[in-house]
C-alpha cells in the first residue's frame, strides 16, 4: 500500500497541480507526505566568463540571486504547508541546496512514489524556460514517478498501457501493490499490428490482476499507427484519472524519456501518468 509520497515543488503553475495531486493522495491513502524545495545553487553560482575586473560584480549578483531564490523556495514551501494543513494532511517540508534532480532522487529513497510536474522550473532564478529535471529524474529515480499535467481533469478509473516485457510487468505489479487503483476498474490497453499478439499482451496483464482480485477489463487494439497516438486517443476517450505506463518494445526503462513513444505520451497526456522505476 502507498505509505509515503514525495512531491518536488518549484513554485510554477505546473507545480501547483503536482501539489494538489500529492495532497489528495496523502489524504486518500493516509500516506506520509514530504514536500521538497531545492535552492539551485550549482546553476546560480556556476563559473562563467566575465570581463576583467568584473568578478566582484558576479559575486554580488550571485549572492543576490541566492538570497532571492531562498526566499522564493521558503515562500512556496510555506504555501504548501498551509494548503496541506487546510486539507487535514500533515506534511514534512524539506528545503535543500544543490542540483534539483540529484536532490529529488536522493529523497526518493525514503518514499513510495515521486510526484513531479510534467514541466519543471527548478532553474527559475536563472532561466525562464522549462528545465531538464523531469528527464533526469525519470532516468535515475529508484521509485515510480507520477508525471502531472498543468490541469487536473476529473476522471475515474485507470488505463494501463501494457506493452509486455520485464519492465512493463514490474510497473504493473508495483502500481497494483501500492493500491493506487483504490478498487476502481483498471483498463489494460495493449497495441499491436497483429490481433493475436495484442490480445495475448492484454491477457498477460489481465491474468495477473485477476489473481489479485482487481477489477479490470481488457482492451486490445489492432493498429499500425504510432503507439503514442493510440494511447493518447484512448486516454482522451476513456477519461481515466491516471495512466500507468511501462517500457514499450525493446527500450529499457532507464531510456524511457529518450524514446519517441514515452516522450510523446508524457508531453501530451491530459491526465497524470505513473511511470515505473
Q: What do these predicted regions represent?
A:
Residues 1-60, 140, 153-221, 240:
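Small/aliphatic-rich secondary-structure junction motif
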Residues 19-21, 26, 93, 101-152, ...:
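Gly/Ser-rich helix-loop-strand patches that form or flank binding pockets
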Residues 1, 40-43, 67, 71-114, ...:
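Structural beta-alpha unit
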Residues 11, 91-94, 122-126, 164, ...:
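Short, flexible loop segments at the rims of nucleotide/cofactor-binding pockets, characterized by
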Residues 56-72:
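A short acidic, glycine-rich active-site loop
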Residues 122-124, 193-198, 224-225, 251-252:
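Short, small-residue-enriched loops and turns at beta-alpha junctions
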Amino acid at each position: 500500500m502507498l505509505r509515503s509520497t514525495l512531491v518536488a515543488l518549484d513554485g510554477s503553475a505546473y507545480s501547483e497541480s503536482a501539489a494538489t495531486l500529492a495532497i489528495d493522495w496523502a489524504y486518500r491513502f493516509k500516506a506520509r507526505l514530504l514536500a521538497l524545495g531545492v535552492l539551485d545553487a550549482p546553476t546560480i553560482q556556476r563559473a562563467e566568463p566575465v570581463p576583467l575586473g568584473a568578478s566582484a560584480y558576479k559575486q554580488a549578483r550571485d549572492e543576490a540571486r541566492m538570497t532571492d531564490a531562498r526566499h522564493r523556495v521558503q515562500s512556496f514551501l510555506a504555501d504548501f504547508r498551509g494548503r496541506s494543513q487546510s486539507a487535514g494532511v500533515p506534511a514534512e517540508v524539506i528545503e535543500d541546496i544543490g542540483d534539483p534532480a540529484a536532490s529529488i532522487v536522493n529523497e526518493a529513497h525514503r518514499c513510495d512514489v515521486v510526484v513531479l510536474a510534467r514541466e519543471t522550473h527548478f532553474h527559475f532564478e536563472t532561466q525562464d524556460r522549462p528545465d531538464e529535471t523531469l528527464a533526469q529524474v525519470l532516468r535515475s529515480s529508484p521509485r515510480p514517478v507520477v508525471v502531472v499535467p498543468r490541469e487536473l481533469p476529473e476522471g475515474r478509473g485507470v488505463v494501463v498501457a501494457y506493452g509486455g516485457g520485464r519492465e512493463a510487468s514490474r510497473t504493473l505489479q508495483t502500481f497494483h501493490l501500492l493500491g493506487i487503483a483504490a478498487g476502481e476498474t483498471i483498463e489494460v490497453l495493449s497495441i499491436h499490428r497483429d490481433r493475436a499478439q495484442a490480445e495475448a499482451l492484454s491477457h498477460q496483464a489481465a491474468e495477473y490482476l485477476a489473481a489479485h482480485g482487481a477489477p479490470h477489463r481488457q482492451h486490445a487494439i489492432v493498429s499500425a499507427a504510432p503507439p503514442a497516438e493510440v494511447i493518447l486517443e484512448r486516454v482522451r476517450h476513456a477519461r481515466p484519472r491516471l495512466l500507468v505506463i511501462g517500457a514499450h518494445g525493446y527500450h529499457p526503462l532507464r531510456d524511457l524519456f529518450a524514446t519517441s513513444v514515452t516522450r510523446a505520451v508524457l508531453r501530451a497526456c491530459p491526465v497524470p501518468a505513473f511511470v515505473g522505476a
